[in-house]
Regions:
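N-terminal hydrophobic/helix-forming segments and targeting peptides
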Residues: 1-439
Length: 439
């Protein structure tokens, strides 16, 4: 593979490995933005913005929005929206269960539509947010237990002879991870307290998710595929961030937006159904002395890329995809269409992204679900219910979506980063006669 792909995907693998969930995604993105000279804003304070300024704001520690103010009066917003959550098991409170006075297992629940069997028989750990009582103040501390801590063991075939005929796994009875012997009871709480630098009694509440400890890597005879956890949607997050940091602001405001809870419907204060994006765009408008009419004009001259990975043709199940629109790893950015509006792409936004990709020399692929399969939806159509702007759903073709270990193409990371860079530097205008311009 070309060196550019190799270097970029080495960075992607490192990003995947240090990003076990949405809290760490935002933490890691903040660090990159700060290193690039961005200033952090707070939602609970007034914003003072300047031409040429670079800023970011977060919500709940699990969603983030970054933007750059152009030197001149801006035309609209170029919004790249993606999500940083992935299907996983979430640890319940009072999680420890002692079995036969011999084992300690943990009580967990599903987060999102996961492939359950992929969580069996592999090293797991836990990461997330811990709320601690420190001198009467609640402090949120991020914890990642970076060791092979637990496993969900399969039932041996000798005890389940029908295993290879298909097993229906029950999340409550079959998927509880083994963390230690009975002698280790209360050990997880002590481990978390040590990681937080507090006593176990100071831990008030937690939001902790299991994750696969297997590091991301590249595979294939030519190392043409990247494999790892949470490629959906961290591959789009990573590529979008690279394009955002490399872009020069044009006539519109480039906006890099990372949302949470897409895998469970986006209906949270930090999800696409909330007002996070809308609030930020309105505050940018107000902080620069523009009125409501200016804001509405800007929305009419805006475009959003809703970036979320797509299904590649599976080599063992080629009949699961559309008859004439097939997508493959390493063959370009995917543009998604849906007659039922599960995806936001229409003829206008689809044409605009085609012009943009041609200008950036980035190949595109088209995706439709089979006509007899419902398929999934993305954050795009949810976001546009809050901010009504032209939008196109894109992504990268991947295999094993919602597995704990997924697979995609190494070239596509670079393709999307290049497209994102061109997108952030561009501007879209709609004329009175109904024609559109890409600047």
């Amino acid at each position: 593979m070309e060196m550019a792909y190799t270097e970029l995907n080495a960075k992607l693998c490192a990003f995947l490995d240090k990003t076990p969930n949405s809290f760490f995604a935002v933490k890691n993105i903040k660090e990159e933005l700060a290193a690039a000279g961005f200033t952090e804003l707070q939602e609970n304070s007034r914003w003072q913005l300047q031409a040429g300024g670079k800023y970011y704001v977060s919500r709940n520690g699990s969603a983030l929005l970054a933007f750059v103010i152009p030197q001149k009066a801006y035309l609209g917003f170029q919004v790249y929206a993606c999500h940083c959550d992935s299907p996983a098991f979430k640890l319940k409170n009072n999680a420890e269960i002692v079995v036969d006075k011999k084992y300690v297992k943990l009580n967990v629940e599903k987060y999102g539509g996961m492939l359950l069997n992929t969580w069996l028989d592999r090293p797991l750990s836990v990461a997330g947010r811990v709320l601690c009582n420190v001198d009467g103040r609640l402090e949120a501390r991020l914890v990642n237990v970076e060791q092979d801590l637990m496993m969900i063991p399969n039932l041996a075939i000798h005890m389940n002879r029908e295993a290879n005929d298909g097993v229906k796994l029950n999340a409550q009875t079959d998927m509880l991870p083994l963390i230690g012997s009975a002698a280790t009871k209360d050990g997880l709480q002590k481990l978390l307290a040590e990681a937080c630098g507090v006593t176990a009694e100071q831990i008030v509440d937690t939001e902790l998710f299991l994750y696969n400890r297997m590091p991301a890597t590249t595979v294939g005879l030519e190392q043409e595929y990247v494999a790892g956890g949470r490629l959906d949607d961290l591959q789009c997050v990573f590529a979008g961030l690279q394009g955002f940091l490399a872009a020069e602001a044009g006539e519109s405001v480039p906006v890099f937006c990372v949302l949470d809870n897409e895998e469970v419907g986006s209906g949270t204060k930090q999800g696409a159904a909330a007002t996070f994006l809308k609030d930020a765009l309105q505050r940018i408008n107000m902080a620069l002395g523009r009125d409501e009419e200016d804001y509405l004009v800007s929305l009419a001259n805006s475009l959003m890329l809703s970036a979320d990975n797509a299904h590649a043709v599976h080599p063992n199940h080629t009949d699961k995809n559309d008859l004439t629109n097939k997508t493959y790893p390493n063959e370009g950015v995917v543009v998604k269409y849906s007659a039922n509006q599960k995806y936001t792409t229409d003829a206008v936004s689809g044409a605009l992204v085609q012009l943009l990709a041609k200008k950036a020399n980035v190949p595109l692929q088209l995706f439709y679900n089979r006509s007899d399969m419902a398929g999934g939806s993305t954050l795009g159509n949810i976001s546009t219910s809050q901010v009504a702007i032209k939008s196109v759903d894109i992504g990268l073709a991947q295999l094993a979506m919602h597995s704990t270990y997924e697979m995609a193409g190494v070239k596509d990371t670079a393709y999307l980063a290049k497209l994102a860079q061109a997108f952030f530097a561009a501007a879209v205008a709609e004329a009175a006669d109904g024609t559109y311009f890409l600047k």
